[in-house]
Amino acid sequence: VQDVNVKKQFIEEEQLLEEAFKLAVTIFDSGFRPDFIVGIWRGGSTVGIYVQECLQYLGVNTDHISIRTSYRGQPSYGELVDNPERIRVHGLQYLFENLNRGDKLLIVDDVFSSGYNVEAVITRLKAKCRRNMPEEVRVGVPYYKPDKNLSGRKPDYFLHTTEDWLVLPYELQGLTPEEIVQHKPDVADILSTIQQGA
């Protein structure tokens, strides 16, 4: 459950695209050349597509895949903080079959907050890949919330630190109709046609 006193920062689609390309250049400039890129669904998939595309343009060919995390019966993100072991990771079979010890793995998400999603992915990969688990695993995100981090892991690459409630371009849940009208007017127009037709 989000604190109503936390400031909402609305991220525009064009802004997220630019941040993803900047993240890719930051990764490239560091000298890291991933063999695999894993985007964590939902927002990490979007960022991962742009990171992969930019790295490929810069001559870094990668294998790339999107995976998903979920919470075992937990309807609320807030409950996750007290029960991180309840995170499930879906869609890893391709990685189990293709990762090797010498590979370099980049995990991408849109926001690194508690760190539990990334930690769950790495823990699950280590358990199943065992000796084939890549020795070099790095994490990249446009947005990092250090005060919310409970995992003991910090992203290797991030562009911004914030404690704001980030509202990403695709998000509608948790927004009031007034916020949608103000910050997502095109979406508000589309939604109003549905409501009128209902």
What are these regions (language model features)?
Residues V1-A198:
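PRPP-associated nucleotide enzymes
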